UniProtKB/Swiss-Prot annotation:
It holds the Pfam family PGRS. Disulfide bonds: none annotated. Keywords: Cell wall, Host mitochondrion, Secreted, Virulence. GO terms for cellular component: extracellular region; host cell mitochondrion. Residues 461-480 are annotated as: Disordered. Contains 7 GGXGXD/NXUX calcium-binding domains. It comes from the Bacteria. Belongs to the mycobacterial PE family. PGRS subfamily. Residues 4-94 form the PE domain. This is PE-PGRS family protein PE_PGRS1.
Length: 496
């Protein structure tokens, strides 16, 4: 019965509807009573008299049953009406104590918060005030014990967005406000810091729109400064040159993690009538947590795509963040982000993917991040961007510690057009003191044009070299990596 919901208004409406049905039936029964209970005899013979008497008896029995049914109907309608009244009374009785309790709670909080509100401008318990729209006003700080920071207000024309308010002991930072529009867009506000014990950093505000100039930069994500919490996401860059030739705004970086938590993701670069904006870098982990993902580069409608942000560094026990994807460009593709390095124990982040440069050169894939200083694998390299000048695959990250495998090289991008080769495969990363080298990336596909595979990574002391990546359309396969100096076998060359 916990899922049963009763609406007194609905019950009362149903009772009224049923009462109308009963009234209509009573009218119909009354109209039918006279012609059915007193039938005229068709003839003077006994058969006609008996038939008329039989039908009259049926009619009288029907009227008797109808009277009983209508009596039951009236009782049912009365019960529904009474139920609606009782439910409404119960709701009223329950609402009054709850409203009184809420009033008492608010009064208590007002009394408790009054001293610190007067002295420090912030409550003990409660959320900070939000900044007003179109003012660029900063969000208020959250309660000293509990409460989120207020959100920053959006900026007016040529005005930066407000910063998000900081939390107190427990709570999340407020969001940064969106930057205001202008000939050049204004900056988005930074996200507020998370609580000293628990809480995430607030996201940064997006950059403002540039009507003929550059888009505004996105605000940085707030840091998680306490024990538990993740960094805030960086704000995306503003759109640039909607009526002109401006560049996209650069995105904000992700916030740093708490001791236990992940770095914030970098924001995406803004779209530009000329070049795309830069993607924001991923925030770093601190103790136990991963680095944030790098933001993608922005689209350059008549120029180059924006370069992507790099992945954040992993914490002591954390993976590096993946690099962002380069921005699409009308001329050149934006550079891919590099994967973040791990801390002491974990794996490097993957390199970001390259991007198409529709008028000239597509970008190569990003290099994978290095593995942990004690043990951990290198991150894989990113894919090369496709195009008429396809990008090469990214190199795999190295395993720099005691144990670990080198990261695999990324595949080359596909070549577009007659006789256009694909990109070369990326080389594999080297292994740890004990560990194998990474596999070389395969060559990108092309129009019957030869392209080469990447080389396998080398082992160091104990381990096998990585295999070379395959070539394409007669292009050479990558060389196998060398085996360990103490023990190990060389990698197999890739097929052509």
């Amino acid at each position: 019965m916990s899922l049963l919901i009763t609406s007194p208004a609905t019950v009362a409406a149903a009772a009224t509807h049923l009462a109308g049905i009963g009234s209509a039936l009573s009218t119909a029964n009354a109209a039918a009573a006279a012609p059915t209970t007193a039938l005229s005899v068709a003839g003077a013979d006994e058969v006609s008299v008996l038939i008329a008497a039989l039908f009259e008896a049926y009619a009288q029995e029907y009227q008797a049953l109808s009277a009983q049914a209508l009596a039951f109907h009236d009782q049912f309608v009365q019960a529904l009406n009474m139920g609606a009244v009782c439910y409404a009374a119960a709701e009223t009785a329950n609402a009054t104590p709850l409203q009184a309790l809420q009033t008492v709670q608010q009064n208590v909080l007002t009394v408790v918060n009054a001293p610190t509100q007067a002295l420090l401008g912030r409550p003990i318990i409660g959320n900070g005030a939000n900044g007003l729209p179109n003012t660029g006003q900063d969000g208020g700080p959250g309660g000293l014990l509990f409460g989120n920071g207020g959100n920053g207000g959006s900026g007016g024309v040529d005005q930066a967005g407000g910063n998000g308010g900081a939390a107190g002991l427990i709570g999340n930072g407020g969001s940064g406000g969106v930057g205001g529009p202008g000939i050049a867009g204004s900056a988005g506000g930074a996200g507020g810091a998370g609580g000293l014990l628990f809480g995430n950093g607030g996201p940064g505000g997006a950059g403002g729109i540039g009507t003929t100039g550059d888009g505004g930069p996105g605000g940085a994500g707030g840091n998680a400064i306490g024990l538990f919490g993740s960094g805030g996401t960086g704000g995306m860059g503003g759109v640039g040159g909607m009526g002109g030739v401006g560049n996209g705004g650069n995105a904000g970086n992700g916030g740093t993690a708490g001791l236990f938590g992940h770095g914030g993701a970098g924001g995406a670069g803004g779209i530009g009538s000329a070049d795309g904006g830069l993607g924001g870098g991923g925030g770093n982990g601190r103790f136990m947590g991963n680095g944030g993902v790098g933001g993608a580069g922005g689209y350059g409608a008549s120029g180059d795509g924006g370069n992507a942000g790099n992945g954040g560094l992993g914490g002591v026990f954390g993976d590096g963040g993946a690099g962002g994807t380069g921005g699409l460009g009308d001329v050149n593709g934006g550079l891919a982000g590099i994967g973040g390095n791990a801390g002491f124990v974990r794996n490097g982040g993957a390199g970001g993917n390259g991007q198409l440069g529709s008028g000239a050169v597509s970008s190569a894939g990003g290099m994978g991040g290095n593995g942990g200083l004690v043990f951990g694998n290198g991150g894989p390299g990113g894919l090369g961007g496709p195009g008429t000048s396809a990008g090469n695959g990214g190199m795999g990250g190295n395993a720099v510690g005691l144990f670990g495998q080198g990261g695999a090289g990324g595949a080359g991008g596909s070549g577009f057009g007659a006789g256009i080769p694909g990109g070369r495969g990326g080389d594999g990363g080297s292994g740890g003191l004990i560990g194998d080298g990474g596999t070389g990336g395969g060559a990108g596909a092309g129009d019957a044009a030869a392209s080469a595979g990447g080389n396998g990574g080398n082992a160091r002391l104990i381990g096998n070299g990585g295999d070379g990546g395959p070539g394409m359309f007669g292009g050479p396969g990558g060389a196998g990596g060398s085996g360990g100096t103490i023990f190990g076998f060389a990698g197999t060359p890739g097929p052509s």
